[in-house]
């Protein structure tokens, strides 16, 4: 998911599927590489781990054929994938104690003065909320109004695989 599409509030189904597929491939297929059986010259069977390239090729082929692996995304997988952290999204099993702060983002130090002048107005985090404005955490909400005024469904859980 590119940050530009997140900033604009546009999240296509393809980008979400791509993100979920990346999570699955990075967290599950690299940790649990499939084994295949091979025969040695004397006829005995041995198990051999597939290389990462073969596992990725199998995953790519499965995706093209419409095969969706059925997995549960647990907290351990999310803890391992720190590179998917975002200032806008936090994946956690636990309900937060308080809402996230709406503070100014830190401006990086830039050597180019022209770039600095263009960005003099600081941007606020959290100004584009996907949910209705509430002063408390809402856990039982099933629908909301997005930033364009459209009614959207709030997912309570994400199911992966064929329905």
UniProtKB/Swiss-Prot annotation:
GO biological process: cell surface receptor protein tyrosine kinase signaling pathway; modulation of chemical synaptic transmission; negative regulation of neuron apoptotic process; nerve development; nerve growth factor signaling pathway; neuron projection morphogenesis
Location(s), subcellular: Secreted
Chief location: secreted
Gene Ontology MF annotations: growth factor activity; nerve growth factor receptor binding
Gene3D superfamilies for this protein: Cystine-knot cytokines (2.10.90.10)
Prosegment residue ranges: 4-119
Example of a GO cellular component annotation carried by this entry: axon
Annotated stretches, region: Disordered: 35-61
Annotated keywords: Cleavage on pair of basic residues, Glycoprotein, Growth factor, Secreted, Signal
Coiled coil segments of this chain: none
Annotated signal sequence range: 1-3
Superkingdom of origin: Eukaryota
Glycan-carrying positions: 112
Pfam families: NGF, NTF3_N
Family label: Belongs to the NGF-beta family.
Function: Seems to promote the survival of visceral and proprioceptive sensory neurons.
UniProt name for this protein: Neurotrophin-3
């Amino acid at each position: 998911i590119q940050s530009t599409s997140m900033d604009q509030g546009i999240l296509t189904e393809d980008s979400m599927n791509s993100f979920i597929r990346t999570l699955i491939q990075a967290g599950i297929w690299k940790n649990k590489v499939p084994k295949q059986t091979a025969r040695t010259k004397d006829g005995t069977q041995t198990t051999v781990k597939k290389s990462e390239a073969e596992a990725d090729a199998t995953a790519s082929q499965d995706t093209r054929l419409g095969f969706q692996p059925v997995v549960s995304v647990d907290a351990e997988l999310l803890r391992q994938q720190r590179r998917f952290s975002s200032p806008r999204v936090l994946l956690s099993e636990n309900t937060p104690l308080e809402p996230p702060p709406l503070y100014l983002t830190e401006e990086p130090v830039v050597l180019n003065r022209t770039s600095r002048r263009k960005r003099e107005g600081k941007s606020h985090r959290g100004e584009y909320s996907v949910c209705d404005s509430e002063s408390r955490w809402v856990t039982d909400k099933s629908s909301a109004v997005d930033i364009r005024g459209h009614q959207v469904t709030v997912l309570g859980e994400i199911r992966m695989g064929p329905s």
